Regions:
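Reductase modules of NAD(P)H-dependent flavoproteins
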Residues: 1-5, 34-162
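Active-site beta-strand/loop microenvironment that shapes enzyme catalytic pockets
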Residues: 9-35, 125
Length: 162
């Protein structure tokens, strides 16, 4: 649906957060940005994928993503949260919200600059994501409810979970 449409401005940074089969639309975005030749839409922004899976054997399309990292080093990055192989800063399992939190300053700077953030995958990731973002807002002295509402009203917040 319209919830997951890409920005019209091809210079807009895009932060993608996916778990499991939620990688499907993110892969389509990445292919649109870096593989398909679309003269009318030449992506010039940053595309940053956070992918949460149980272990490295479950990193779908990693070969494609690593090729994009090599071909577009300043424009594409991918970070994995491997819950059965990595630990978070508290020593627990590394979930998607923990991986995003590792880069909280960069993520917040990008969002402050107009980046779009897309979430797709298991609905169980969203409570952890929202709780983490609320904690980061508190650390930064930001009113969380106003901040999140601002992202939504500015068209920067896109969620498709199931």
């Amino acid at each position: 649906g319209q919830v997951m449409l890409l920005p019209k401005d091809p210079s807009t940074p895009v932060i993608m957060v996916a778990t499991g089969t939620g990688i499907a639309p993110m892969r389509a975005y990445i292919r649109r940005f870096f593989v398909e030749d679309i003269p009318s839409w030449n992506f010039t922004g940053l595309a940053w994928l956070f992918m949460g899976v149980a272990n490295s054997d479950a990193t779908l399309y990693d070969d494609e993503f690593q090729e994009c990292v090599k071909r577009f080093p300043g424009q594409f990055r991918v970070d994995y949260a491997l819950s059965r192989e990595q630990n978070n800063k508290k020593g627990g399992k590394m979930y998607i919200q923990d991986k995003v939190e590792e880069y909280k300053d960069q993520v917040f700077d990008l969002l402050d600059g107009g980046a779009r953030m897309y979430f797709c995958g298991l609905k169980g990731m969203m409570p952890g994501i929202l709780s983490m973002l609320e904690g980061v807002c508190k650390e930064k002295g930001i009113n969380y409810d106003e901040w999140l509402e601002g992202l939504k009203s500015n068209g920067q917040w896109h969620v498709e979970v199931y």
